Amino acid sequence: MALEVLMLLAVLIWTGAENLHVKISCSLDWLMVSVIPVAESRNLYIFADELHLGMGCPANRIHTYVYEFIYLVRDCGIRTRVVSEETLLFQTELYFTPRNIDHDPQEIHLECSTSRKSVWLTPVSTENEIKLDPSPFIADFQTTAEELGLLSSSPNLL
């Protein structure tokens, strides 16, 4: 997982494509789309090869009840827009091309936004925080020459 926090933008119900459930999440580096392949409207199972992300990217994690498309944001034709100084918007499409010729191909537009600020790099303290007194156990700690010798490597022992 990237250092950036994953931000869930939306849980979408794709009514045009057999009521597939689609979830999208993203970070500064990655975009992840999860699809539950059971169409509720007709009790139809959608196969992994009937779906692709953006410019032909297949599901790269296939489980019985979820397909995951996990790609770098620079892959698959994923587009990046700068919304503000702190926010990026990623845009792509998920395509459904059914094996059954009685169903029309479908396209869903997906968007996900994330913050440019990493939670790992955000300061958690301020200059107004409470300062603790130094520990009395370390304050008068003195090492002897013998202790220092034990901590260093001796050329005679090598």
From Swiss-Prot:
Signal peptide: 1-17
Gene Ontology biological process: oocyte maturation
Tissue expression summary: Highly expressed in oocytes.
InterPro entries: PLAC1_fam (IPR033222)
UniProt entry keywords in alphabetical sequence: Cytoplasm, Secreted, Signal
Gene3D superfamilies: Zona pellucida, ZP-N domain (2.60.40.3210)
Highest taxon, organism lineage: Eukaryota
Residues spanning the membrane: none
Name of the featured protein: Oocyte-secreted protein 2
Name of the gene encoding the protein in the UniProt record: OOSP2
